[in-house]
Swiss-Prot record:
InterPro entries: Cytidylate_kin, Cytidylate_kinase_dom, P-loop_NTPase. The lineage of its organism: Bacteria, Pseudomonadati, Chlorobiota, Chlorobiia, Chlorobiales. ATP binds at residues 16-24. It comes from the Bacteria. Its EC number is 2.7.4.25. This is Cytidylate kinase. The keyword Kinase applies.
Length: 235
């Protein structure tokens, strides 16, 4: 497609379970389209990091007034690929296995979702964005012009997360076994699917993409083709 036709901007919503390749693919797709990439998962991870650091994890589930005050005093900002929590860069801190194991529980809280969904909608309302998460196509932007639901085999997702943790560890030790990661991913899937607020589900009008045997480059190319098709049909 000629580049001139790509000047029309759309919202691309990419949803799917943990470690299905959403964030890396969405980031590279945004670069290819010259769009803004919005990592909604990083926002939920930042809030999760805050409650874990301050030992408030249990309290936020039993004291709504406390949670409301905590959220009113919490600022999450995305600047490119960097994530800031209350003025501190936490880009690496939010990717620990501890945060990964707790984020689904924290993001199930209505007050947390309400605050972050409002922020996400404000960021994307100008269009020209690629946003990934669990409920982008169903809750945040149900009117997105392109919705993609990425899936992958749990074993493959565990391998990806294992390689990611290993690469980020100074010692090369991921600090967790592959088997444990697979169990945690399966548990996270269950938590995401069964939570009362904004459960993980494929939007009726989403294109499903199984990434189990796909490289990141192939994933980006597949969604780029879908995006250009959608843009070409805009009047």
């Amino acid at each position: 497609m000629p580049e001139a036709t790509l000047t029309k901007k759309i919202i691309i919503a990419i949803d799917g379970p943990a470690a299905s390749g959403k964030s890396t693919t969405a980031k590279q797709l945004a670069q290819k389209l010259s769009y803004t990439y919005i990592d909604t998962g990083a926002m939920y991870r930042a809030v999760t990091l805050k409650v874990l650091r301050d030992a408030f994890f249990e309290k936020i589930f039993s004291d709504e007034l406390f949670l409301k005050k905590l959220l009113s005093e919490t600022e999450v900002i995305l600047k490119g690929e960097k994530v800031f929590l209350d003025g501190e860069e936490v880009t690496k801190d939010i990717r620990t296995n501890e945060v990964s194991s707790k984020v689904s529980k924290v993001s199930s809280l209505p007050l947390v979702r309400e605050k972050l969904v409002e922020y996400q909608r404000n960021m994307g309302k100008a269009r020209g964005v690629v946003m990934d998460g669990r409920d982008i196509g169903t809750i945040v932007f149900p009117d997105a012009e392109l919705k993609v639901f990425m899936i992958a085999d749990a074993k493959e997702r565990a391998k990806r997360r294992y390689a990611e943790l290993k690469a980020k560890s100074p010692s090369g030790d991921p600090g967790v076994t592959l088997e444990t990661l697979e169990q945690e991913i399966l548990q996270r899937d269950e938590d995401d699917r069964t939570r009362a607020i904004a459960p993980l589900r494929k939007p009726d009008d989403a294109r499903e993409l199984d990434t189990s045997k796909m490289t990141i480059e192939e994933q980006v190319a597949a969604i780029y083709e879908l995006a250009t098709d959608v843009i070409s049909q805009l009047k």
